[in-house]
Regions:
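Bacterial N-terminal signal peptides
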Residues: 11-23
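Auxiliary, metal-adjacent structural segments of Zn-dependent hydrolase domains
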Residues: 41-140
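Post-HExxH zinc-binding segment in Zn-dependent metallohydrolases
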Residues: 46, 157-162, 166-215
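Active-site recognition of the HExxH zinc-binding catalytic motif
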Residues: 50, 144-161, 186-187
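Acidic helix-start/capping segments at beta-turn-to-alpha-helix junctions
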Residues: 59-79, 170-173, 204-214, 266-269
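Short pre-active-site segment immediately N-terminal to the catalytic Zn-binding motif
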Residues: 131-147, 174-178
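Pan-zinc metallopeptidase signature
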Residues: 220-348, 353
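C-terminal soluble interaction/assembly domains
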Residues: 335-336, 340-420
Length: 420
């Protein structure tokens, strides 16, 4: 969950360029007869169609290459090696494990590379400004993936996607929101192109967009790596595509063709704005609740970042249920976290605070987070419960959770009891 490493939310995806992931059942997959000339002709036609839809101009040709599954896997491994360090990986894993999003034996790099290799249909590398098409994709998938990735190439020529993503890398939740802009627009344009070829359009058809979004959310269910991945990874992989598409559609309904420029020039600043576009239009900004303090002598700050509405929805769904996540998470107003490490003692402390839109929502989350702690740890001893405090000892040390007005805060992994 470290800022600067995968910007947390989409895992390593942001370092790899933009990937169009498979949304087709295994029965549809057969080895494609890839014809470079046919692909070249498709690229020209698709770019022309995208220009007509968006009003964005093509500045130069988009180079492309065919790539095998093994080459995709190696490409992703190389990108991990080039873009991260072992310490980056360790910190990222620590954050995910401290919140309970992944098990203690989780291998972040391997899981992400395997997951993206399994899902890839095509990807646009905005470092090299080049489109890669997988050689195992059938013609139907290839055609859709081409439009998706060419939408990225067109946006890159206007807005410099690598810079766009890097500008948000110091804020975890904002980074995911920007990824949703990038992937959501490409997914919307891919879907609109398909609709137009059938004589239809997404314009003015919010229900069709919602149906497509739900279909994509369930489209990875036949892939074993995806199926076995932690909920956090399954949700964060599809969020930029599904929720990003719905967000782009909402902006299109309000601004028409100007929407394709607007979302890049004035992007959403949180996953909440993506999930609730009216909050984007109203410029509702996330708050920054103060983190709880502890005696940090001998500790080094590893990382600090944001924890957004999307994260809280996943956390509540994982440890409680989806219904409660849907009811409570939208009341999120802002969240922060930090990890501090004492290497001599091999101890990592999680500091965490989240603000809600009213005291009642905070009270509900205070109760919900107690359930989260009871379920994420194998052993828990509660020494204080009530009057806005929940404290005791868990698997990794002492903890204390406090409710103060509309803010819930937590310290976890402490050496000494927080409440006597």
């Amino acid at each position: 969950m470290a800022k600067g490493y995968g910007q947390k939310r989409a895992g390593l995806l942001l370092f790899f360029g933009s990937l169009c992931w498979a949304q087709f059942s295994s029965a549809q997959l057969s080895r494609a007869q890839n014809d470079a000339r046919a692909i070249f002709e498709e690229i020209g036609k698709d770019l022309g169609e995208l220009t007509e839809i968006t009003g964005l101009k093509i500045r130069h040709k988009v180079p492309f290459d065919l790539i095998t599954k093994n080459q995709v896997n190696q490409f992703l491994k190389d990108r991990v090696h080039d873009a991260t360090t072992p310490e980056d990986l360790r910190i990222e894993e620590l954050g995910l494990k401290k919140f309970g999003f992944v098990p203690q034996n989780f291998d972040l790099a391997k899981t992400t590379v395997d997951l993206l290799t399994e899902q890839a249909a095509a990807f646009y590398d905005y470092h090299k400004k080049k489109l890669y098409i997988t050689d195992w994709a059938p013609s139907g998938m290839r055609q859709a993936a081409l439009v998706h990735e060419l939408a990225h190439a067109l946006a890159d020529q206007q807005f410099h996607l690598e810079r766009f993503i890097k500008q948000g890398r110091d804020d975890d939740d904002l980074s995911m929101a920007r990824t949703a802009v990038m992937e959501g627009q490409a997914t919307w344009l891919m879907s609109e192109a398909i609709e137009r070829r059938a004589g239809q359009s997404l314009t003015g058809s919010a229900k069709s967009v919602e149906m497509m979004s739900r279909a994509m959310e369930s489209g990875g269910s036949e892939y074993p790596v995806f199926d076995s991945a932690p909920l956090y990874f399954r949700r964060t992989l599809v969020f930029p595509y599904t929720q990003g598409m719905l967000f782009q559609n909402a902006v299109c309904e309000k601004l028409d063709q100007d929407a394709f420029t607007q979302v890049f020039r004035q992007p959403p600043v949180s996953t909440q704005q993506v999930l609730h576009p009216q909050k984007y239009f109203d410029a509702v900004m996330p708050t920054r609740p103060a983190l709880p303090k502890f005696s940090s002598r001998g500790y080094k700050r590893l990382v600090a970042g944001t924890v957004g509405e999307m994260d809280h929805a996943i956390l509540i769904e994982q440890f409680l249920d989806e219904r409660r996540a849907g009811e409570l998470a939208p009341h999120w107003r802002g969240g922060l976290y930090a990890l501090d490490e004492n290497k001599r003692e091999r101890r990592v402390v999680l500091s965490y605070a989240v603000e809600w839109d009213d005291a009642e929502s905070a009270r509900q989350y205070f109760a919900a987070y107690q359930e989260v702690l009871r379920k994420k740890w194998r052993n828990i001893e509660v020494v204080s419960s009530g009057d806005g405090t929940f404290a005791g000892r868990g698997d990794d040390g002492y903890f204390v959770v406090r409710l103060e007005g509309a803010v819930v805060s937590s310290l976890e992994g402490l050496r000494d009891p927080a409440v006597n």
